[in-house]
Structure formats: structure tokens, C-alpha cells
């Protein structure tokens, strides 16, 4: 069962920008895991380990308010410190019950007086959201069976049946052979979703009708994230994909289930470092 959890955090002192990178947030997550299961934390630290989780960059509460529809714009890099006392949030998604079960002790025994460390700053976890919120669209939880059963399987009267509007909220890139590509083609996006769905859901889709998916609206641009160790180029923005032609209802259902799954799994590379955060926007209608 995938969970999209939002941790609300309060730093006690400024967090310098060099400690707000995906690498440092990844380390903080492993520290959280190790606090309840050191063996699991060590295993996840192994670069070859199955990493059934994704992480967001650290957000200030204003991140959901400054532009973008439905909280679609997120802050993915920081040039200035986050001041002490600034309410922040951090999205952690867990893609299987094993990992969620291990971390249940952490959620249930949450000590608001225990500090966690991000660089020189102490952070307190003040609350955790795990269900949909009107002002926090990144929190949710559904079983894989629910995602599949609730996915539309027909064109019908609802516009969303044949139109999938995905927002890419942090820089997104895909592996193509030995290199990265930033173009969100139907193959790159839906094969990324399909691979993770088949890995974790227990409801295998042997083949989806990728040839019936067509981009109909594209509003994207590239961003470059560079630090002392690496450079990452990815796209941000919005793409609407339409399901066109003669398509079996079960294939429509599978494509819609994958699109809804994007909230939890993200797409493309470095999703455990804050990249590739994507989400389906509802109620946007068809774009011509």
C-alpha cells in the first residue's frame, strides 16, 4: 500500500542552504529509519538496495501559496538559509507495507521534543499528515487495489477519462541507455510508472497501450541544479496526455491507474533525492 506522508517540521536555528540538498535529506531519512530499525537503515544505505520510498525537497509553508495550481509549484533548491522558527514540510512516500510497518513505531511514538539534525540545525517533527488535505495535496494513502479499482475504464462523460494532466513539480529526467533525457515522452513517463507499479503493487500489468497515449498540451522548461559534486538537468511544468483511438476498457483503466500512482512514486531519476515529483491534476478538463 503506498503512503504519501507530509511531515511538518520546525527548525530551531537557521538551516544553511548547503544542507538542504537531496543528499542531506536522504541522509536524514535514513537516520529516521535507523532510529527504529538500524539494520533496515543500513540496508537502505547500500546503493544497490531496493529503495521503496521517495523524498521531496524541504518546503516552507509558503511553497504551496506562491503560484501554481493546487500546490503544483515546489521549491527544489535553496540559495538562502531557512530561518529558525520557519514552519516547514517534507513529503516522504513509502511504496510498500514493509517499510511503512517498520516506521509505524516512529509515527506512533512521535516525540515532539526530540530534535533531529539537518546540518547544524535541530528540527522538531510537530505533526504528520497521511490523508488528503484541502491545502496539502501531497498527503494521501490508498491501497494498490483501490488505485486500480477507482481508475476510470471508459471514455464516458467524464473528461478525465481520456485526458491525463501531469504536473512535474521538481526537476525530472529519465535514463535512456547510458545518458539522461529530459523529454517527458509517453514512453519515458509511463514506462517509469509501469516499472514501479509492477514492482510494488502485486497487480501486474503485462503490457499497457502506450501507443494510444498522445501529448496534447505541453508547457515545460528545463532547470539545472548544480552543487560541488554533480549537475542535474530536468524539466518542470505540465503535460496533458490524451488516450486516443480504439482502446480496450482494461487498458484505459491501467493507464489511469498509473497516472494516479504518480503522486506516490514520482517519475524518472533521483526520486529518493527530491527529483521527479509528479502528480495528476484533477478537474482541469481536456486541452485542445
Predicted region positions:
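RNA-interacting cores
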Residues: 1-288
Amino acid at each position: 500500500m503506498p503512503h504519501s506522508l507530509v511531515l511538518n517540521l520546525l527548525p530551531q536555528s537557521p538551516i544553511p542552504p548547503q544542507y538542504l540538498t537531496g543528499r542531506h535529506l536522504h541522509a536524514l531519512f535514513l537516520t529516521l529509519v535507523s532510529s527504529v530499525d538500524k539494520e533496515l537503515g543500513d540496508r537502505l544505505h547500500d546503493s544497490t538496495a531496493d529503495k521503496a520510498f521517495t523524498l521531496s525537497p524541504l518546503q516552507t509553508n509558503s511553497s504551496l501559496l506562491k503560484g501554481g495550481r493546487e500546490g503544483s509549484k515546489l521549491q527544489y533548491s535553496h540559495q538562502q538559509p531557512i530561518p529558525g522558527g520557519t514552519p516547514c514540510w517534507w513529503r516522504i512516500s513509502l511504496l510498500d507495507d514493509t517499510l511503512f510497518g517498520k516506521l509505524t513505531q516512529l509515527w506512533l511514538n512521535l516525540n515532539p521534543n526530540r530534535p533531529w539534525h539537518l546540518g547544524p540545525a535541530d528540527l522538531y517533527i510537530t505533526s504528520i499528515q497521511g490523508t488528503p488535505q484541502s491545502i496539502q495535496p501531497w498527503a494521501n494513502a490508498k491501497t494498490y487495489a483501490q488505485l486500480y479499482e477507482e481508475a476510470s475504464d471508459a471514455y464516458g462523460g467524464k473528461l478525465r477519462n481520456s485526458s491525463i494532466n501531469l504536473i512535474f513539480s521538481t526537476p525530472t529526467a529519465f535514463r535512456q541507455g547510458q545518458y539522461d533525457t529530459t523529454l517527458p515522452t509517453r514512453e519515458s513517463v509511463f514506462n517509469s510508472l509501469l516499472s514501479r507499479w509492477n514492482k510494488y503493487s502485486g497487480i501486474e500489468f503485462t503490457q499497457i497501450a502506450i501507443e494510444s497515449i498522445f501529448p496534447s498540451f505541453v508547457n515545460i522548461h528545463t532547470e539545472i541544479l548544480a552543487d560541488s559534486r554533480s549537475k542535474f538537468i530536468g524539466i518542470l511544468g505540465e503535460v496533458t496526455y490524451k488516450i486516443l483511438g480504439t482502446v480496450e476498457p482494461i487498458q484505459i483503466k491501467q493507464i489511469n491507474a498509473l497516472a494516479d500512482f504518480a503522486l506516490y512514486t514520482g517519475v524518472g531519476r533521483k526520486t529518493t533525492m527530491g527529483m521527479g515529483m509528479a502528480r495528476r491534476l484533477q478537474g482541469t478538463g481536456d486541452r485542445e
